[in-house]
Amino acid sequence: MPLFATPFAQLDLVRQPEQDGEPLQAFDAADEYLLNQLHERGVTAQCRVLVLNDAFGALAASLAPHVQVTSSGDSHLGFLALRKNLARNGLDLGSVRFVPASETAVGPFDHVLVKVPKTLALLEEQLIRLHGQLAPGAQVVAAGMVKHLPRAAGDLLERYIGPMHASLAVKKARLLIAEAAERPQPRSPYPTRYRLEQPPLTLLNHANVFCREGLDIGTRAFLPHLPRSLGALRAADLGCGNGVLGIAYALLNPQAELALVDESYMAVQSARENWRAALGERPATFRADDGLAGQAAGSLDLVLCNPPFHQQQVVGDFLAWRMFLQARDALAAGGELWIVGNRHLGYHAKLKRLFRGVEQVAANPKFVILKAGK
């Protein structure tokens, strides 16, 4: 892979999770454009720079030796990538302060560099949280590849930050440059809530939660077929989102021990709040993690999973395959992985390569529910 070369540094960067023969770079032309623009503007060692949504740490690692850097995002994989790339390039792990997107990064900041996320609700919440955190004369610069940069991103900068103009495109990347101006204290529209009829739950969803306006159709297909009356099993909701699968399973299985795990900090926060609303002080574990990478081998009896099929703009089954591998390792002998997936993804064949037995629990024209036994 080529080095990421800017006026600030030349770095050897990797994506997270790493794949053998990874065809994709851990940076893009929008990262390069952001850093070139900041260098032209001029920075000193005293400059306080906030980086938002730095997918694999390219921005923060480049700036770490030169300015005071805070990085914030909603991906735990992004945090792991930042740490790995700092270490890989001989940089101090403490040179970048990381703040999960579920919390507010406290300034004041002189410069804010933003990679525009796929979910504009996350961008909106991040811009709202910048209120009161910008130094006088601060500039907020958002960037993305032109094909992934919606007009609405500029509208959000105008609304919450100040006057905005778009740059010319360079290497198919564009900047949206906003000058901080007085704005009234905004009211955030997040979290959102929706009502589920069965089981009867009101579910809270922070800004970056998948399908925050209503239950996704895969989970809707899965819910009626969750296993029940299984006793005191150790179970995990892998890729838990707002926690609906884990909560519904816990209601059906009062003795079960649950761990709700997601790589999104906002998802884990949503799951924690929804669990408390539905189940009070019943114990459970909530963890932002790289799937079940932090789970002891053989420590689970059941894993529930509605696997994702994209990472940022990249679509594929590599994340699902990795989750299946992690589930197999975390399950005890006789344990089961239950999943829902689109029919066309062929998860049945993939699971047969990892588990001793795979059964179809239910199906409809779009989705299939499978259980795989270890």
From Swiss-Prot:
Look up the EC number in the record and give it: 2.1.1.174
Taxonomic source organism: Pseudomonas aeruginosa (strain ATCC 15692 / DSM 22644 / CIP 104116 / JCM 14847 / LMG 12228 / 1C / PRS 101 / PAO1)
- What job does the chain carry out? Specifically methylates the guanine in position 1835 (m2G1835) of 23S rRNA.
- UniProt GO BP: rRNA base methylation
What broad class of enzyme is this?
transferase
| Localization of this protein | Cytoplasm
Principal location class = cytoplasm
Instruction: State the similarity comment.
Output: Belongs to the methyltransferase superfamily. RlmG family.
Q: Which InterPro entries match?
A: DNA_methylase_N6_adenine_CS (IPR002052), rRNA_m2G-MeTrfase_RlmG (IPR017237), RsmC/RlmG (IPR046977), SAM-dependent_MTases_sf (IPR029063), Small_mtfrase_dom (IPR007848)
Q: Which gene encodes it?
A: rlmG
One family from Pfam that matches here is: MTS
Enumerate the GO terms in the molecular function aspect: 23S rRNA (guanine(1835)-N(2))-methyltransferase activity; nucleic acid binding; rRNA (guanine-N2-)-methyltransferase activity
- State the UniProt keywords alphabetically: Cytoplasm, Methyltransferase, rRNA processing, S-adenosyl-L-methionine, Transferase
What PANTHER family has UniProt attached to this entry? RIBOSOMAL RNA LARGE SUBUNIT METHYLTRANSFERASE G, RIBOSOMAL RNA SMALL SUBUNIT METHYLTRANSFERASE C
> A single GO CC term, please?
cytoplasm
**Quick check: keyword Hydrolase in the entry?**
no
Cystine pairings recorded for this chain? none
* HAMAP family tied to this protein: 23SrRNA_methyltr_G
Name of the molecule in the record: Ribosomal RNA large subunit methyltransferase G
Q: Which domain of life is it from?
A: Bacteria
Catalytic activity entry: guanosine(1835) in 23S rRNA + S-adenosyl-L-methionine = N(2)-methylguanosine(1835) in 23S rRNA + S-adenosyl-L-homocysteine + H(+)
